[in-house]
Structures are given as structure tokens and as C-alpha cells.
């Protein structure tokens, strides 16, 4: 492009002449030059009187042969004659079009890349989009080189030069996610100029939410920006529901995107983060000054004290673990040419060990390390000795007295951008994919969490995970231990996949929930009745009254003690407490303490007193089954079973889907974890489909405008439901580290 610009700026030249010079020079003498088709409007691809269709080949005038300058001049005069013959109106159209993207015959200039969607989340502008993608794909060698033109080292990782380009990248998820008609930054800018109160906008976006008064206006506007940046939610396809449908898709699809998280590495023995003896707990003991466990992944904290990170690095450094069945399954799909791309959030490099070639490491990996100062880059083996000896690795090229000359593994820390390669890949893969499979990820952190909503909504989506993801709508949900599910799929796929199976037994399907285990029945028989006396007219608050509060506290304590063995999940010898259960218990105990408080009985009139006590009692009743008797449905299955819950949910061993004792309604392990009150409402098996986003109403009637890429920042405030997840994910990247890119047994 630099050469083209130089030629175009030569005195007496023109962009078209420059292109013609090059084309004529590269063609053997005597061969005709082809006229490039023009896309600038009707009638410009042929001369008057010529039939429609492809442009005919042209002969260079004999006098011009062998003289590139003369050939260019001849073609230029011929083009001018055509434009004049086409009429004044067409000439004006040609002039306007040439100014935008066509520099005349012989050279088509670089096309300007418009926003991804000019209309509100409109993905139908195929004509212009296809031409742009073809040009961009040709420029980066798309599909010809899986690393998009980057150099490949023998171990399959980037060269230093390509990584430096990635660090300087300004690419973002706005390059591949559906864009609104008017961007969120423009929308906010307009309202800032007219003095709109951001709380008014937030009230429309989140009617049931009241932002804390201490939040300043700029923080609230940042919240608005992030909410408006959310792409519309995908709706489930009604024609894809069963595991048989999933197997058929795996057999037929040729461009599969597999998005993997920590769940695929659990069985590999990689230490978890959040258990009692996990990495976080041990770091808290060794580094009491660490403000919070996630700080070890904060780039600013790393510059101040890199020791916590390198202690963690030793725990999961490459070379200590072997790939899981999930990794091998993806590698075989890659080998058979079915894998379009594996986007992994993990940093353990097990994808490379398994032999996966089409891999995008969204959050980096331990494969290489580079100096914070000079960017000198080395292989992971160069710093292995220092890391295992718990010595902070230093850059060999920087001065010894430079405190920041640290060799940092190329993991994406909080405060750092994702590699440009991720955004480049997603920009084109989103239009190529014919099947999306999410394995072992809760998709809580952006921009990876935006992938399911950003690909065409008709593309089938399959979830393989321990727990359901209520904020997304998958066509088939296979819930349980990822290796168990992949093992069953391999049995059904047969051939080379069947050879991967760790368990030779094919599972049998049941459609009715198995009865409770003897252990659970014995436990339930010892429980006292629900600690609320509800009359026949339970809808009347006047007739609902709690018993003595001390009874509730006593019963809760007994239940907590008896239920300890039911509130943990097993994962290959590692026990992890359910944080949402703990949170629920705290809420219940807090309510009980309020009931014990004698001041509560002395507040207000008798009517106000009764209503307040009724409200507390109602909260306790909602919390009671969640705290007292929730059990994993998967524990009722025998070793060779899985449960089918129509229309599209399957429960395998290890699934974190629970059953409440009172009404036996299924609920997710994450139920109630985002609720301020701690209450939990069990979702139905077939979750209602969401209507189109209400956010679209903000854009109706507004003109198309480009917008700057989105950036995460700001702070959030409490609310319930999907809106809370949208805010939490969009506002701060500092969230669930283990759900982001660091392996744990809770994915």
C-alpha cells in the first residue's frame, strides 16, 4: 500500500495510472490486460452497446506495448471516453464511487471498513460485507495460514515480531460483535451535551434498579455504555433439542468453533483456586498483604510485587500435566478438518500438548515470557528453573538495577488488552462457523462471553458444562463432568472417536428422575417440619406468622450441621464448597437475627409490625429449602445412567443441578447467587425465550453513525437477574478469575 501511495503522488500521475503501470509491467509483452470489473453503479461495467456480463478482455494498443507509461495513458483515455459516453448522471455516480473505493481501472484502492452493522444489530448487509471480507482475507491470508500471516515457531507459538504487533493493537470486540445503529458512546455524548441525568436512562434500562447515590455521573454513564454494548440475546432453535441432534451436527458440520474453559482441564489434576486448600487460600497465608487473590493477576500489582504470581505459576507451569479426553476430542476434530477454531480461555498450554493446531489462546499462556521493559522474548523453558526455584526471572538484556526488568509469562493480566489475533479471528470466523460448542466455561467475562450472541443466531449451539448458563440459550444442554459427556459422544460418533473413550461402557438414558437415595431419605426424615405455620389462606399476609425466632435459629444450625455433606461437589478427589449455599445460609441467619431483635417488635404500629414480621417470615420460607435440603440430581444416577429432561437438557454425573426437597423442582447451583435478598426461585426446565432487547428502543429513528471501540471500566451496582450479569460482566473485567482463564474445578 505504501508503494501504491508513492506512485499515486508522483507528479503528473494518477492512482489509476499507477495501477495500470504496475499491471502492464507485470504482464508479458503481447498479452492483453484484463479490465477489472467496477462496482460503482449501473452501467459502469460495460461500454454503451455492449452486452451485460463479464467485461471483455482488452488489447493494449500496439504503440503502447512495451511501454508501461503509454499503456497506462491509453487505458486512462479509454476509461475517460467510457465515462463520457455513459452520460452525465452515470459520470457523476462514477466520480463519487471512485472517490470512495475505486481508483480507476487497473487498481482498486483499499476499501474503507464501515462499522460491522450499519443498522441496529443488522447482519444482512451481505453484498458490501462479502467484498470487504474477501479483500481483508486476501490481505491476511485467511484460511491459508491458521495464524493469519504470523510467523510460526516450531512449538506452534507466535514470533516476537507478531506479538509486538498484537501488543500495539487497538482491535476490540466491537470489530466482530453486532453494532447498534448509533453507538453507545455517541448516544451518551448526545445526552451529555443536553444535560440528561444518567439515572433517568438507567431507570428506563433497568426499571427495578436504583443505583447507589454515591456513584458519580461518569460512573453511571459508563454503566449505560456497557449495558448498551451488549449484543441481542440469541433465541433457542426449536428444531434442535436432543443428544441425537448434537451427534448428527458433530458428524455433518465442517466449521466448528469450540470455546473451552477451565472445565476441560479439571480432570488433568490442575490445582483449583477456590477450595479450602486451593491456590487462593494458600496465597492468603503466604502473602497476607495481598489485597485480594485476584490481585496477583493485576498488572499494576505485578509491577509492585510479582512474587504471588510466580508462586501460582509454579503450580500450573507447563510440563506437569497431560491433556484430558476433551482436549483429545478437539484435537481429533481438528485432524479430521472439522474444527474451524478452538478459542480457549485456559493458560495451561494443554491444547498444544494434545496437538490442536487451530487454536486461539484468548488470554495468553505460559508458552512464552517477555520482559516488561525491552519486550525481549524467550520460551517457557528459559525461565522454568527460576520459577520452580521461586526466583523472580530477570531479563538478561536489561541493566541489573532495573527493577521492572522482569520476564513475565505472556498471560493476559487485568489491565491488558486481549491479543489482536483473537479479534481478527473472531471477525471472520463468526461468518464461517456452522456449529458452536461451549465446553467447561460459564462465560462470565467479556469479550469471550459475547461470542455466542455475536455469531449468526441460526448457527446451532451446544453447551457441555457442569451447570446451565441461564443468561444464554443453547439448543442442547449436556450438563455434567465434561469428560463423561465427551466419552458418551465419542461412543455415539464411533470410528476414531470411539478409540478415545476412557470408559468402554455406553450410558443408558432415563427420562424420570430417580428416587432419592437412602441417605437423603434418612436425613430428611430427621428434619423438623418447615418452620412456618401457614394457614389455608396462605395468600393473606394477615394469616401468616413465624414461630419463635429461636426455633428457627436452632433448626437452621442443625440443618447446616447435618447438610454439610450434601452441599459439596466431588471433583476427582477435590472437594469444593458451594459459595452460593454459604451466602444463602448467611442471609437466612441474618434474617433470623432480625427476628430475634426485640427492637423489631417495638417499631411502628401493630399493623406495621405484623407486615414487617410477615415479610421476614416469607424470606425465611423461601430460603429454607435452599439451605436445608438441596441435593445434586446427578447423585441419584447409577454409574451407567444419564437423565433426559425435555426438551433439551441432559443430566450426567457431576452436573451441578439441584432438587429442592419441598417441591422437588430442579434448580441451578447458581440460583440466587446474585440476589440481594438471598432468595432463590427455581427456574423452569424450559426457560422462556427473551424478546428482542429493550435497549433497541433507544436507537429507533436515529441516524447511522460510526462509534469508537468499547472499553470496559467503571463500577456496578446491585440488581437481580440477567441485567445484573450484564452489568457485572461489562463494567469490570476484574471478576471471577477462575471462570475467566485460569483452571479450576468450578468452570
UniProtKB/Swiss-Prot annotation:
A motif (Nuclear export signal) lies at residues 138-145, 425-431. This is NAD-dependent protein deacetylase sirtuin-1. Residues 61-100, 666-677 have a biased composition (Low complexity). Inhibited by nicotinamide. Activated by resveratrol (3,5,4'-trihydroxy-trans-stilbene), butein (3,4,2',4'-tetrahydroxychalcone), piceatannol (3,5,3',4'-tetrahydroxy-trans-stilbene), Isoliquiritigenin (4,2',4'-trihydroxychalcone), fisetin (3,7,3',4'-tetrahydroxyflavone) and quercetin (3,5,7,3',4'-pentahydroxyflavone). MAPK8/JNK1 and RPS19BP1/AROS act as positive regulators of deacetylation activity. Negatively regulated by CCAR2. Changing residue 235 to R: Impairs in vitro methylation by SETD7. Residues 569-580 have a biased composition (Basic and acidic residues). GO terms for molecular function: bHLH transcription factor binding; deacetylase activity; DNA-binding transcription factor binding; enzyme activator activity; enzyme binding; histone binding; histone deacetylase activity; histone deacetylase activity, NAD-dependent. Residues 236-496 form the Deacetylase sirtuin-type domain. Residues 120-135, 687-707 have a biased composition (Acidic residues). Its EC number is 2.3.1.286, 2.3.1.-. Induction: Up-regulated by methyl methanesulfonate (MMS). In H293T cells by presence of rat calorie restriction (CR) serum. Methylated on multiple lysine residues; methylation is enhanced after DNA damage and is dispensable for deacetylase activity toward p53/TP53. Phosphorylated. Phosphorylated by STK4/MST1, resulting in inhibition of SIRT1-mediated p53/TP53 deacetylation. Phosphorylation by MAPK8/JNK1 at Ser-27, Ser-47, and Thr-530 leads to increased nuclear localization and enzymatic activity. Phosphorylation at Thr-530 by DYRK1A and DYRK3 activates deacetylase activity and promotes cell survival. Phosphorylation by mammalian target of rapamycin complex 1 (mTORC1) at Ser-47 inhibits deacetylation activity. Phosphorylated by CaMK2, leading to increased p53/TP53 and NF-kappa-B p65/RELA deacetylation activity. Its cofactor is Zn(2+). Interacts with XBP1 isoform 2. Found in a complex with PCAF and MYOD1. Interacts with FOXO1; the interaction deacetylates FOXO1, resulting in its nuclear retention and promotion of its transcriptional activity Component of the eNoSC complex, composed of SIRT1, SUV39H1 and RRP8. Interacts with HES1, HEY2 and PML. Interacts with RPS19BP1/AROS. Interacts with CCAR2 (via N-terminus); the interaction disrupts the interaction between SIRT1 and p53/TP53. Interacts with SETD7; the interaction induces the dissociation of SIRT1 from p53/TP53 and increases p53/TP53 activity. Zn(2+) binds at residues 371, 374, 395, 398. It comes from Homo sapiens. NAD(+) binds at residues 261-280, 345-348, 440-442, 465-467, 482.
